[in-house]
UniProtKB/Swiss-Prot annotation:
This is Ferrochelatase. GO terms for cellular component: cytoplasm. CDD domains: Ferrochelatase_C, Ferrochelatase_N. The gene is hemH. One of its GO terms (biological process) is heme biosynthetic process. PANTHER family: FERROCHELATASE, FERROCHELATASE, MITOCHONDRIAL. GO terms for molecular function: ferrochelatase activity; metal ion binding. Fe cation binds at H196, E281. Belongs to the ferrochelatase family. The keyword Ribonucleoprotein does not apply. It is found in: Cytoplasm. It comes from Synechococcus sp. (strain WH7803).
């Protein structure tokens, strides 16, 4: 029987307060997140950003118990998926590959090679493809695969996205229905989908399909919810977690919540649509920050739908995805990371000078100007960072 290694891709998260700074450094040192014209500036800029942001981030993690539960939950998802696949007669072993914290992708690759896997299925725990999530993880695997003869020989099947998979859609609708039924008037409960945002340039210039997949997914879930409930509910889709001065996908969650508050929304059911596990953006950003904002804006009842975590129908859906993938042709990492437009995606160890679309998508002018401004402020001793007491 063929031995199958199932690699689950996820972001990773700091498990202790002292991990927050290094985690942020790893995040911002990724050239897929911030691309600079001079490689030598990448790590200094990552150090600067992580240093400036770590204090606030540590406060957020303290408010949810001192660390992210993402690793624990993802490893439990991996165990339950492995068990279910073996029940189906598939000799599968699951491996967790985190992008920015332990266990890192390198560790997962080393383990599956040591275990003598015959083939690999790569399953991102991001239902919707984006350059900055699944795309970055696929490209990290590409980097590790190049020049590694034993890894290159393994047949590989990548699942690019699965936002429209019936098992996922059904599981989401069932969990939403649980909260809608608790509303004073279930027919009037307003379903509020909050997806992680991305810069608008990713979609408009690089052809990132993320927004289209989120919107299509929302429609599918609402259709399934309507069948479960026997009626249609009003709903809103917004995007959270915006950082920096550039424009991200709109409407922003904060602004949409304020509008619903002004409209005297009585029952609000908040759905973390792009997150399959509880972590900082559900437990702190939604449960604490957005709950407070919505209440102050006038929302009476704020309910948040729990993350899928190890919800059995969800794990069944993941097993279906792996099973279907094994029955189909190989799907390479190149094909999984491909974008519909002609923007060139550079290997992570290579760099590009210039003011073109690809460099702008990956951060472009703002990153370069921002770093230049920081250097000028260090030299002059005057500027906004000094005014804020950060320098």
């Amino acid at each position: 029987m063929s031995r199958v290694g199932v690699v689950l891709l996820n972001l990773g998260g700091p498990e202790r307060i002292q991990d927050v700074g290094p985690f942020l450094f790893n995040l911002f040192a990724d050239p897929e997140i911030i691309r600079l014209p001079i490689p030598a500036l990448q790590k200094p800029l990552a150090w600067l950003i992580s240093t400036l942001r770590s204090g606030k981030s540590q406060e957020a993690y303290r408010s949810i118990g001192g660390g992210s539960p993402l690793r624990r939950i993802t490893e439990q998802q991996a165990r339950e998926l492995q068990s279910l696949l073996r029940q189906r007669g598939i000799d599968a072993t699951s491996y967790v590959a985190m992008r920015y914290w332990h266990p890192f992708t390198e560790s997962a690759v080393a383990d599956l090679k040591a275990d003598g896997m015959d083939q690999v299925v790569v399953l991102p725990l991001y239902p919707h493809f984006s350059i900055s999530t699944s795309g970055s993880s696929f490209r990290e695997l590409q980097r590790l695969r190049q020049g590694d003869e034993s890894f290159e020989k393994l047949p590989i099947r990548c699942i690019r996205s699965w936002f429209d998979h019936p098992g996922y859609v059904r599981a989401m609708a069932e969990l939403i229905a649980e909260e809608v039924r608790q509303s004073d008037d279930p027919t009037q409960a307003h379903v509020f989908f909050s997806a992680h945002g991305v810069p608008k340039s990713y979609v408009e210039e690089a052809g990132d399909p993320y927004q289209k997949e989120i919107e299509s997914c929302t429609d599918l879930i609402m259709k399934e919810l309507g069948q479960l409930m026997g009626h249609d509910n009003p709903f809103t889709l917004a995007y959270q977690s915006r950082v920096g001065p550039v424009e991200w996908l709109k409407p922003y969650t904060e602004e949409a919540l304020e509008e619903l508050g002004k409209a005297k929304t009585n029952d609000l059911v908040v759905v973390p649509i792009s997150f399959v596990s509880e972590h900082i953006e559900t437990l702190e950003e939604i449960d604490i920050e957005y709950r407070e904002l919505a209440t102050e804006a006038g929302v009476v009842n704020f309910r948040r739908v729990r993350a899928l975590d190890t919800y059995p129908p969800f794990i069944e859906g993941l097993a279906d995805l792996v099973t279907t993938s094994l029955e189909g042709p190989e799907v390479s990492l190149d094909a999984a990371a491909e974008l519909p437009t002609k923007v060139k995606l550079y290997p992570q160890e290579k760099w590009e000078w210039g003011w073109n679309n690809s460099s702008e998508v990956w951060n472009g002018r703002l990153a370069m100007l921002g770093f230049s401004g920081f250097l000028l402020e260090l030299i002059s001793g005057h500027g906004p960072l000094h005014a804020l007491g950060l320098l």
